């Protein structure tokens, strides 16, 4: 088993044990595990839809066209009740990341940055040298609200306080809240470190301009909503799906297809254009 999988499963196992061990007497260990699991799954799923499917593929790459009410709703819900991610600064960093790809100007990571440096950069990224997030939606009330630094602090204090109120125990709430954010940091490291180091994963396209790799195991693909298929994505960043063969497991694309069935999203003209060198007969979308 690869090291990144060991770390991911270890965090999840430690989270489960901590939920049972620190559960207060009036809840008990098994109910504590159930509460912790519910918090984990809900925050992960909403966060994945928000960041990977909507902000990443919908706004940053304009490959998918979501209903605007859905974009604004999930943005407010995730950033109020889940792990906060500023949509404006994230889109700006991500576009710069694709423009410079592991070279000076990439705010996420340079090719020379190791594990610990990249871990630090997940929390304190390099300064952005340009503003590439000028989309009209960033001027909407919801995006201006959640992008406010005061909101970033207040929302996290609020959702921690709400969790504390619901479970009735400060220690138990702290364990759930903090440990899940460690898991979220691991997800970020999958995307920023392990998929940008040629010692890990596999490369379908030998693009020398960056170090992007595909990591295709079940846990990373599920946890990141397929954002760990970075070599595919960097080769065709405007394509609406991240898997480039039917045999590649693509959890993120499955959720997008489900949202399409619900009438929440459609392909953009650029997102639906299948490059000739991508080994897919069709997008199946």
At which residue positions do the language-model features occur?
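Non-catalytic, topology-defining segments of multipass membrane proteins
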Residues: 1-190, 194-195, 239-285
């Amino acid at each position: 088993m690869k090291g990144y999988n060991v770390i991911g499963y270890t965090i999840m196992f430690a989270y489960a044990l901590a939920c049972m061990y620190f559960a207060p007497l009036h809840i008990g260990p098994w109910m504590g595990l159930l509460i912790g699991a519910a918090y984990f799954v809900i925050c992960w799923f909403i966060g994945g839809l928000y960041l990977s499917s909507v902000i990443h593929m919908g706004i940053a790459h304009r490959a998918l066209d979501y209903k605007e009410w859905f974009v604004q709703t999930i943005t407010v819900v995730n950033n109020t009740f889940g792990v906060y991610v500023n949509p404006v600064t994230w889109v700006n960093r991500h576009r710069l990341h694709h423009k410079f790809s592991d070279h000076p100007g990439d705010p996420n990571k340079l090719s020379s940055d190791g594990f610990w440096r990249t871990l630090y950069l997940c929390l304190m990224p390099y300064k952005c040298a340009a503003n590439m997030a000028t989309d009209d939606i960033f001027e909407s009330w919801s995006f201006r609200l959640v992008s406010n630094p005061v909101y970033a602090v207040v929302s996290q204090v609020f959702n921690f306080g709400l969790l504390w109120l619901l479970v009735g125990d400060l220690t138990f709430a702290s364990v759930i809240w903090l440990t899940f954010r460690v898991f979220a940091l691991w997800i970020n490291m999958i995307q920023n470190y392990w998929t940008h180091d040629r010692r890990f994963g596999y490369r379908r396209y030998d693009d020398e301009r960056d170090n992007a790799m595909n990591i295709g195991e079940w846990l990373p693909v599920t946890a990141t909503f397929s954002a760990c298929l970075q070599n595919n994505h960097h080769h065709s960043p405007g394509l609406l799906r991240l898997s480039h063969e039917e045999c590649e497991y693509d959890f993120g694309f499955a959720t997008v297809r489900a949202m399409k069935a619900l009438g929440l999203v459609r392909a953009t003209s650029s997102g639906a254009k299948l490059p000739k060198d991508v080994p897919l007969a069709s997008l199946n979308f």
